[in-house]
Amino acid sequence: MALAQWPYLILALLSGLAVSGFPRNPSLLLGKRSLPGRAVDGIEVYSTKVNCKVTSRFAHNVVTTRAVNHANTAKEVSFDVELPKTAFITNFTLTIDGVTYPGKVKEKEVAKKQYEKAVSQGKTAGLVKASGRKLEKFTVSVNVAAGSKVTFELTYEELLKRHKGKYEMYLKVQPKQLVKHFEITVDIFEPQGISTLDAEASFITNDLLGSALTKSFSGKKGHVSFKPSLDQQRSCPTCTDSLLKGDFIITYDVNRESPANVQIVNGYFVHFFAPQGLPVVPKSVVFVIDVSGSMHGRKMEQTKDALLKILEDVKQDDYLNFILFSGDVTTWKDSLVPATPENIQEASKFVMDIQDRGMTNINDALLRGISMLNKAREEHTVPERSTSIIIMLTDGDANVGESRPEKIQENVRNAIGGKFPLYNLGFGNNLNYNFLENMALENHGLARRIYEDSDANLQLQGFYEEVANPLLTGVEVEYPQNAILDLTQNSYQHFYDGSEIVVAGRLADEDMNSFKAAVKGHGAINDLTFTEEVDMKEMEKALQERDYIFGDYIERLWAYLTIEQLLDKRKNAQGEEKEILTAQALELSLKYHFVTPLTSMVVTKPEDNENQTAIANKPGEGPLDAEEVPSMAYLTSYQAPQTPYYYVDGDPHFIIQIPEKDDAICFNIDEDPGTVLRLIQDPVTGLTVNGQIIGEKTGRSDSQTRRTYFGKLGIASAQMDFRIEVTRENITLWNGDSLSTFSWLDTVMVTQDGLSVMINRKKNMVVSFGDGVTFVVVLHQVWKKEPAHHDFLGFYVVNSRGMSAQTHGLLGQFFHPFDFQVSDVHPGSDPTKPDATMVVKNHQLTVTRGSQKDYRKDISVGRNVACWFVHNNGQGLIDGIHRDYIVPNLF
């Protein structure tokens, strides 16, 4: 199971003089300097608030800073936040003089193109980059006019992981100046009940903290508030410097009347498991230590100091050994030995005598350690009910013996065979951390970077403490067959004391009366099974404290866990498997608005008749991929490229969006139910799309008011001999003579060379042909007892770059550039919808201003799209007449 990463947040606000455009040197924005008073260069930060809501370990954090420019000229203001590496940004908004500019999460490839254009123009400023051990720095800068106000609001979410028996939230506070309204508010809601809650600050004495801090908890609720006055913020009674510079730490734990707790909201569930009071399972541990020349000096002394402290904590029931590697491999003992006082004393002397020397032979050292653990198990020289772990520490890359990372990974994977975990500790930055992480992950362990600081020995000790006390091995979390969908990881090699296993998923039947779960594992004495049964009505009562619950928190927790685990699996996947994992993680990231390694957040703000576009990326631990946007993202001043898109949805409304005009044209087609219309036909690529019309459940006598929709779509590729029939119930795929049928209740991805089909349960289907063509089919479901309307389909073309110039059809003809002019706007028969004259394709038409719905992102409500409506079935806009597009069947 994944071990804890402490959540961190650092707040800092910088201000500087405005410059023409934006500075070319990112350090102008990222450099820190002391700000002496409440206002600097005319910029006053008058409010900074951090609002954290924690519901069942899932934290929703909003950081809001407000500033005003008192100067007579425009100034540049920068907003700095450091957030946990384990967190996902979910939103950023910029509000200037009451106008709010929201952020949008997009696929990273889109941001990459914007970044490349920005670099070519030389207009860049830092936005997001990795910062320190557990942090990522978010920085955004904006020009603020004289007398204007600006508000920055950043939202991020993460799952708080249990670490040594507590959930911990670290807020690193650093406002850089006195702030009139400074406040941190944390509200915690835990259905199990809160057992402990504490808060402390490293930058203020307990006497001063007491009057600025309030903390309380009772039953399920906990509350912490830190609200220092201006005088309490001063570094001395007459100073204008702020003493708010350091850690604000909140820790808590929950009641554990039973080992497990299950919570269910809106068809999603989360299962927490953390038993207490179990005897510790004896362990066999092999320490594989790099003693190459690069470990010379301080690193070697810190490593030896940590190992000596670890030896003091090894339990007498444990077995251990040390393997040292440089250019060759040496061992303390030929085999594992029990941790008797005599052996511990001898091991301590061995550690003190370690000397650095030579090269780095990782492969042979790991294989020696694995062989030692396997042999001890096979020869029964260790207790039957014990577990094995291997811990490697290295500060560099393999450079002797087998040095190819992929071959070392293969050798280690085959040798371990899934029997025990490998933990890799990377000392410093001069190593291939991705290699260490990937090798650990595929062997049920994890990697941790050890930073070259004065506390490196404490970092090593702290890691060992996390794995020192296994309480269970071979943990399996089980649910009734066919009751659960989309389950996160439910199998773990170990459960360690002070940690917690978290599993989430979706109920197949939301109307069930009860829910059962079982956790099985091997204990120190016998095999254990922990069962939990939930009464759904009782669960509903227990979760009625809606004031503390933000939205569908369990669904978002499930999405967070799923994305995190998909990204971990993706690191070692190859070929088609990697493509599927990437597509699944990307789809969830976009759906739930998470900034992950596959997505970026883009904020666009009009300024000086240009668009200012901020792009926020998710950095990683490893070295930069040359093909990706750097982990430092950018704020650019240029017109972001826009892509036209086309769709038909509703009654059936055809909408053509034209970015060059910042406008749209729409028209209806009024035809009888059963009619099939040609939407797209490309004779070059062989792609066709046809749609069949359905009517209402009860016909209307007035044909002018009847409503029709698309009830069936046919998508075909002649070149690939591939067809898709989409109805309101099923999706059928033909690949030559092979047939596959899925329902709208499925979530599944089908891929082959040049094609991917992603079905998202009860929502939409995304079809991509290579990189140049993407269609989206949206499923609209109505209340089953609705007297008039059926379920129906919407069809969207979101990428048509791969279509040829010969493409035609009711939608396809508009893939080619065309122009239109609108003039003589005047009141129409409906006072809310003006009429106008449109000149298009050598026709002069009377059009009406109206709006249609875009349901791609919000199926239930949709987004209004303003458009000019062309009457009479699009006559004059479409080539020919609408009946020219009627075809006999779907294919």
Curated annotation (Swiss-Prot):
It is found in: Secreted. Keywords: Glycoprotein, Protease inhibitor, Proteoglycan, Secreted, Serine protease inhibitor, Signal. Residues 21-34, 652-891 form a propeptide. Residues 284-467 form the VWFA domain. One of its GO terms (molecular function) is serine-type endopeptidase inhibitor activity. It holds the Pfam family VWA. One of its GO terms (biological process) is hyaluronan metabolic process. Gene3D superfamilies: von Willebrand factor, type A domain. One of its GO terms (cellular component) is extracellular region. The modification Aspartate 1-(chondroitin 4-sulfate)-ester is found at residue 651. Residues 1-20 form the signal peptide. Residues 29-158 form the VIT domain. Glycans are attached at residue 91. It comes from the Eukaryota. Belongs to the ITIH family. May act as a carrier of hyaluronan in serum or as a binding protein between hyaluronan and other matrix protein, including those on cell surfaces in tissues to regulate the localization, synthesis and degradation of hyaluronan which are essential to cells undergoing biological processes. I-alpha-I plasma protease inhibitors are assembled from one or two heavy chains (H1, H2 or H3) and one light chain, bikunin. Inter-alpha-inhibitor (I-alpha-I) is composed of H1, H2 and bikunin, inter-alpha-like inhibitor (I-alpha-LI) of H2 and bikunin, and pre-alpha-inhibitor (P-alpha-I) of H3 and bikunin. This is Inter-alpha-trypsin inhibitor heavy chain H3. It comes from Bos taurus (Bovine).
